Amino acid sequence: MARTVNCIKLGREAEGLDFPPYPGPLGQRIFEHVSKEAWQQWIKMQTMIINENRLNLVDAKHRKYLAEQVEKHFFGEGADQIQGYVPPAA
């Protein structure tokens, strides 16, 4: 039986991640409170953030910025918006 979590992003019970997706306490917090579905949404957002901001993940400052964005996305006011990006109409 799949592990379920009360997903903080979706606001409902959903299938949980199989393992912490990020190192340290932040990864454990994500593991305990974020669903697979919400994590996949983050992966898409993360890709846009990396590409549009031309982040180089070898650079410690860029990794720190991305870590701040993942924390804001799930546990804060939301990640920074991509300049010029307009979400598709539902």
Curated annotation (Swiss-Prot):
Q: Does the keyword RNA-binding apply?
A: no
Keywords, alphabetical = Iron
**GO molecular function annotation:** iron ion binding
Its cellular-component GO annotations read: cytosol
A Gene Ontology biological process in which this protein takes part is: cellular response to oxidative stress
Per the record, the coiled-coil ranges are: none
Q: Gene3D superfamilies under this entry? A: Fe(II) trafficking protein YggX (1.10.3880.10)
Entries under Pfam families matching the protein:
Iron_traffic
Check the record and name the PANTHER family matching this protein. Answer: FE(2+)-TRAFFICKING PROTEIN-RELATED
Q: Which family does it belong to?
A: Belongs to the Fe(2+)-trafficking protein family.
Role description: Could be a mediator in iron transactions between iron acquisition and iron-requiring processes, such as synthesis and/or repair of Fe-S clusters in biosynthetic enzymes.
Q: What is this protein called?
A: Probable Fe(2+)-trafficking protein
